[in-house]
Amino acid sequence: MSDTASTATGHRKRDKPQLSCNACRKRKRVRCDRLHPCSNCASRGLGSTCTFAAISSPTNMPPSHGHSIPVQHRVESARPGPTNSMQTRINQLENLVIELMNQNNTPGMRTGLQNQGSDARSDARCQPTPLSSETEFEYPVAPSPSDHGSINTRLARPTYVSSSHWAAIFDSITELRNHFVQEDIEHGASTVLPSSTVPKPQILYGAWTSETPHAIISSLPPRTTVDRLISRYFNVLDIAPGVVHSTQFLREYENFWMAPQDAPIMWVGLLFAMMCLSAQLQQASLPAHDSRPSSSRASQQDSIAIYREKTIQCLQLGHYTMGGTHALETLILYFLGECFNLKDMEIGIWILSGTILQIAIHMGYHRDAKNFPSITPFAGEMRRRVWAMIVQLDFSISAQLGLPTLIKASQTDTAEPRNLYDTDFDEDSSALPESRPETEVTPTLYVLAKLRLISIGLRVTNVASESRTRSYSDVLELDRQLREARDALPSSLKWIDLGTSLNVSSQTILQRIWLEVTIQQLTIVLHKKFLGVSGLQKDFKTSRAACLNAAVKILELQRLVDDETQPDGLLYQSRWRVSSAFSNDFLLATSILCYCLQNRPEGTISNFDESVSVGLDQIRALLETSKSIWSRQCAESKEAHKAVAALRYVLGHSGADVDSGYTVAERQPLPMPTAALSYFPDLTSDYNFAGFDFGSSDTTRWTAFASDELGEENWSRGAGFQQMDMSLKLEAFDRVVPNSIPSRCLS
């Protein structure tokens, strides 16, 4: 019986293994070099679609026979294929990591690693790990190298971004990342900006002024014009509440018109900065279809440019780097003017914020005035207000660019400003009055609310970006503090349903929305690290639910803001307040849902997780709405353009045609504005990700929909997730075992 069985086994025809990639096998008469990606696919721009058939091990051969599968074959078998389940691929990768580590360690170390490999897929990874005297959950045992951020060195301008930035999360969708890598290699990026583009901020690029103080003052428009601009600044524009004390400034303003040439040049710069912001507000408040003659619009734009130029000249003549009276106030307002209505944040803005911070520290603003008797109560309170604004700018700009904040909380002790009106104190005050109750809505109250959220936000971003691991209990404690901070917000600034806010000003509604979005954004940053592993490690399901629910909430608010800033909306008059800071948070939420939709566990149709109440259909609907919103902004924003490209891909390849009822026609790309098509010539209106068939034909080409002409964007940024995709796992292998496996997707 056994002889018969062995004979039958010995004469069984063996299957011929497929060594070519799937695409080359279909091309016929094309020899595959078996690299990944192979040269044939790479030359056609299809590197990310180059896949190999799985090579299975002999099922009838016991391990003791000594037959082993080469490492390279097992790498190929772990590549995504039609029959590879997500769990199977993870198991293969874990075993491969252990073996590769064993090959590069001493014999004494191998025993421990082999023992570790025997239970690599066990539940031990999710069990509590003793720390000191307590038992706490550790972070995932094999964090991705991109948790520490990523440096894009392919372009002429190397750039860094932290793992919590929205572009890093988009980058974790492997096919998108591989495509953008290929685009960078093939097309590169110009290191020269178009001649018509002036980089921001202008103060970093302009030449030293030859103007005199007399000439600058003489360039002021008639007083009636200046009066209107200053009135608008104090009565409508609350972009920097408290930085300029209205009572003090208006008194100095009257004295200025009596003897203009006697005014300090830095005070004149402050005046021009306020005029510039006010003129920008006037321009932004105009209806979308302005009926004024083009000459009138051009004149207003020229006035804004002149006011900005004069502000810079005053800063230079006043030697702003040395500080002094009005220096920081003028710099802050100039900074806000450069950011006003800015669609995409620029690195020069972050550099300028660092300059402002350094000047403030040089002048001692990071130390509370109560420790210095020579500082009057009035000056001390104004210093607190200015420092509060600098803290907010540092946090906001750093978050938008995915960079660390510059302020170290351990090195500052400046107290919060008090909840006071400007009329409550002035230069002659011998002591400050007590802070008003937070039921009284002063211009400073919103500053206080933001400052308290940011104090938690700084701790959250530090934990999320630190190179050392923190216990999971630290994460949960920060989550608790974040929820407490939300509950402690003044009642007038807590987000409630728009239907119950009909008697509230549009300004207050947007302030509420900003605070709510900030809370949800910090929730994502705090829990994002566990998003990719929580489906397998149940101990992290709290983080998964918090991250997904926060992203959904942000996109719901994006839809609301977009609806209500239309001409007939409740927020139309305050639409200018929706800046790039809002866009960054919306992009972060978009990237989170794209990642989850693209990397959800197999078989998950209705819901991602039992702890997440939102279903796939609702997530797709939110992303479709978000795509429509970003599409309207493509002509002005490169970031919006990238978001649309990613959404088209994800919505076309997330299984929507299986269980959502969407048709191919419904997933056709939205028409792009003419300006966007001229700026991004490779983005064609007939491109459709939904019908794309990976590797099905050599004539299929992936249109270069995201070429980066300016080299400012960084789509090969660190991912910050425990990736469940083969190509991202191989990135980790290259670092654990150098030169053992060729890199394919490194930035």
Curated annotation (Swiss-Prot):
Q: Which GO terms describe its biological process?
A: DNA-templated transcription
Q: An example Gene Ontology cellular component term from the record?
A: nucleus
SMART domains linked to this entry: Fungal_trans, GAL4
Q: Which key words are in the record? A: DNA-binding, Metal-binding, Nucleus, Transcription, Transcription regulation, Zinc
A GO MF term: DNA-binding transcription factor activity, RNA polymerase II-specific
Q: Please verify whether the record's keywords include DNA damage.
A: no
Domain of life assignment: Eukaryota
User: What SUPFAM superfamilies does its record include?
Assistant: Zn2/Cys6 DNA-binding domain
Any keyword tRNA-binding?
A: no
Report the PROSITE patterns cross-referenced here.
ZN2_CY6_FUNGAL_2
Localization, per the record, is: Nucleus
DNA-binding region location: 21-50
Q: Region Disordered: start and end of each range?
A: 112-150, 414-436
Please describe what this protein does.
Transcription factor that regulates the expression of the gene cluster that mediates the biosynthesis of the trans-fused decalin-containing tetramic acid phomasetin.
Q: What is this protein called?
A: Transcription factor phm2
Please state the gene responsible for encoding this protein: phm2
